[in-house]
Regions:
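Small/flexible residues
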Residues: 11, 17-18, 93
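Short, Lys/Arg-enriched N-terminal segments with co-localized hydrophobic residues
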Residues: 1-12
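Sec/Tat signal peptide C-region and signal peptidase I cleavage site
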Residues: 27-31
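Sec-dependent N-terminal signal peptides
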Residues: 17-25
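Subset-of-secretome marker
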Residues: 32-185
Length: 185
């Protein structure tokens, strides 16, 4: 299956992949390991069943080129989940209370997703995740209080068929002010 040649199916798959990668790319973190404020998550090296997916910039470009009503609907859905499109990736706001807790709620609380830290070795943490239509393992590397990376491998069912997927994500702190990106509640 070539994801790049089917515009409608590609768009649906890319929307699902954006949601999937956002949920999987944000592991739990320890108290005050990260700065509060606006964060940008950029995914790369995304593969489904061994096939390389288009670059994140291309996927974001496709979403930016949606008809105005579809784009507004997509942006509203993301806003309700506490994220927005911006720059090179997906943006999320973390409050001081969130970074001081042991649980950074970047995934939608209503999504049914859970994450569990399975090993901590300094600034490298391994974790497992489980969502209604995805599960797998990952590793987070905290480079500083303003940057971390994750690598995840798992299975998901975004199209009605079980698929294997993997991706890398880089998360960077953009600053203390979140602007119009509301924090997760």
């Amino acid at each position: 299956m070539c994801i790049c040649n089917c515009p409608i199916r590609n768009l649906e798959m890319n929307k699902r992949m954006l949601a999937w990668m956002f949920c999987l790319a944000t592991p739990l973190t320890q108290a005050q390991m990260l700065q509060p404020g606006l964060w940008e998550l950029t995914s790369s090296n995304m593969k489904v069943d061994g096939q390389q997916l288009p670059d994140m910039q291309l996927m974001l470009g496709q979403l930016q080129n949606l008809p105005p009503e579809q784009r507004a609907m997509m942006e509203q859905m993301m806003k309700k989940q506490g994220v927005s499109l911006g720059g090179k990736g997906v943006r999320a706001c973390l409050t001081q209370a969130q970074v001081q807790s042991d649980d950074i709620p970047l995934t939608d609380p209503a999504s049914g997703c859970t994450q569990k830290i399975t090993a901590r070795n300094g600034k490298t943490w391994n974790f497992q995740f489980s969502c209604p239509k995805a599960q797998g393992t990952g590793q987070a590397q905290f480079l500083s209080d303003r940057e971390f990376t994750t690598k995840v491998v798992g299975t998901f069912n975004a199209t009605g068929q079980q698929q294997n997927g993997s991706m890398d994500t880089r998360s960077v702190w953009l600053g203390p002010q979140c602007g119009n990106v509301a924090p997760r509640t």
